[in-house]
Amino acid sequence: MIVDLESRVTDLETRLAFQDDTIQALNDVLVEQQRLVERLQLQLVALAKRQEEMQGSLGAADEDEAPPPHY
């Protein structure tokens, strides 16, 4: 009876140790993914700003041009 309980406690302690390791590994991956998401968000904002600037400069150039002769 005592041996069985000791075995069960040892098994539970082993499982707990593996669960702690798994939780830490998952947390590390989550932190890495969050950093990646933040970098991607910054890149997206920069690309959107760049696109707006390019569209603005193209729009201004189009307004200065005379209409084609068929108008």
Curated annotation (Swiss-Prot):
Record Gene3D superfamilies: 1.20.5.300
Source taxon at top rank: Bacteria
Pfam families per the UniProt record, alphabetical: SlyX
Alphabetical list of InterPro entries matching this protein: SlyX
Classification via NCBIfam families: PRK00295.1 (NF001421)
Family: Belongs to the SlyX family.
Protein name: Protein SlyX homolog
Organism: Stutzerimonas stutzeri (strain A1501)
